A protein has these predicted regions:
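Conserved ATP-driven motor cores of ASCE-family P-loop NTPases powering translocation/secretion/packaging/pilus
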Residues: 110-111, 118-191
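P-loop NTPase motor domains
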Residues: 1-128, 132-135
């Protein structure tokens, strides 16, 4: 930590903020995830498993945990692959996917690159690439307008339920190649 912080003006604030964030990942339910004994990868990625993050406090921590799990899944699939274009043998469901795959600006700030945008792009690419290893994904969300466009474009089958918001209807309707009348009907679907 000392060797990575080179600027002196905000060094104390930066260090304190970073240490506080790291400590929060080692307390309570987060501590059980990051510090306790690991579940074997085979059990986590080959069997039926539910990862319930409802008790994780902040959305940022949920996103971090979900992102790390998707990347670990990608590593596991790549290392255990017997070839390319494998048949579907496992499905991962990402519920409330906007927590992980949120639409971000492509703009770069004066401080440097868009870190959040790059991480969403990296995860979206990982999800797309895992199909060749037999991994399928169900991306579920009630607010498609919050999700990154690449996620919507890279899904083949779309199941659309009632969408009261016009912007969501337009977005999903265009992605599913619906006509104007069909897009209008999305607001009238039963709940």
């Amino acid at each position: 930590l000392r060797s990575t912080i080179t600027f002196s003006e905000n060094k104390g604030a930066y260090k304190g903020s970073l240490l506080t964030r790291l400590q929060s990942l080692c307390n309570g339910i987060n501590g059980m995830i990051f510090v306790a004994d690991e579940i074997p990868k085979e059990q986590l990625f080959e069997e039926n498993v539910i990862v319930d993050l409802s008790r994780v406090g902040s959305s940022e921590t949920k996103s971090l945990i979900m992102g790390m799990m998707v990347l670990k899944l990608q590593e596991y699939r790549m290392s255990s692959a017997t070839g390319m274009n494998a048949e579907l043998n496992h499905i991962t469901v990402l519920e409330e996917a906007h927590n992980l795959l949120r639409r971000t600006s492509n703009e770069q700030s004066a401080e440097g690159s868009n870190l959040l945008g790059k991480s969403v792009e990296m995860l979206s690419n990982a999800i797309a690439e895992m199909r060749t290893y037999g991994e399928g994904f169900i991306i579920a969300d009630q607010a498609p307008g919050l999700m990154d466009m690449s996620v919507i474009r890279n899904t083949n089958t779309k199941i659309i339920l009632r969408l009261p918001d016009q912007a969501d209807r337009e977005l999903v309707g265009r992605a599913a190649n619906l006509n104007e009348d069909q897009i209008t009907e999305l607001a009238k679907l039963p709940c």
